[in-house]
Amino acid sequence: MTEAAAQALKTSTHDPAMPARHIRALRLWLGVIAFLIVAMILVGGATRLTDSGLSITEWQPIMGAIPPLTDAHWQAAFEAYQKIPEYTEINRGMSLEAFKTLYWWEWAHRFLGRFIGMVFLLPFLAFWIAGYIPRKLMPKLLGLFVLGGLQGALGWYMVKSGLVDRTDVSQYRLAAHFGVAILIFGTTLWLLFGLGTETREETRASCADSSATRTESRATRWAASAILLLVFLQLLAGALVAGIDGGLGFNTWPLIAGAFIPSGLDAASPWYLNLFENPLTVQFDHRMLGYTVVIATIAQALSLIHI
């Protein structure tokens, strides 16, 4: 058996003794969660694009699920928003109706997070009581739930950065919030696809035991992992671009600021701040990472089909 196959068997969440109907139920459940996470990310993106993220100035994990229901409640929420820099420096004079539009975007984003938590927790308890969850899968699911809870707290930590001295949120916290969302999504898919229907014996039978196969498999695994890491870094770089509105000032392609490698990439001091706070450098890095991902993916595909 190849090393790759042995590793796959070691890390798989599949238990060959699990009935097929248990596997199907767990896969459906995790698939629904993955779909909702994508919806959550899309709504979060819309919340960012509409500058709605600071419209709710407090974090109430339980009672916050209920939106303002009366005129007095709406007025109280609006008055709280009027105290933060985004209103006093950018949106002064905004009407209550315009504020409601911002509020609903942010409320929908937070509500989706709560809803995903319930979609995870309630079926999880039902599956656990019914004996559907294999022993090796249990700590992974619990870890995923904890990560989701931490993501909610991180979201508030991000929003909090824009309530006192800034008119927007910290790009560092925005990138961290988005990065954790991607980790949760990726972990959910990993658990879902780990619940395969083949047995260990079938997997062993399909694996060729040769030195050449082991070497090729190891190289393929490392290359795929490197590409996955590059994609993750590219997503984080995109979040940094969004966090400092870097796309607005440099919106031409393939040139940026009139050149493929523009001047001004080292304008900030100390030098490392350019990677995170210089809009030109942040967008340049984002583009270069994109090119790198494309080239690496094509090279990997060609190597797999032996061209």
Could you say what each language-model-derived stretch is?
Residues 116-121, 179-196, 292-299:
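Hydrophobic cores of alpha-helical transmembrane segments in multi-pass inner/ER membrane proteins
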Residues 28-63, 230-241:
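N-terminal signal-anchor transmembrane alpha helix
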Residues 305-307:
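Conserved small/polar residues in nucleotide/adenosyl-binding loops
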Residues 2-21, 197-220:
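Membrane-interfacial, low-structure loops and terminal tails that flank and connect transmembrane helices
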Residues 47-56, 153-174, 241-250:
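Interfacial helix-loop-helix junctions of multi-pass membrane proteins
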Residues 80-118, 273-293:
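Individual transmembrane alpha-helix segments
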Residues 236-293, 298:
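Membrane-interfacial catalytic/cofactor-binding modules of polytopic membrane enzymes
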Residues 25-36, 136-145, 213-236:
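Interfacial segments of alpha-helical transmembrane regions
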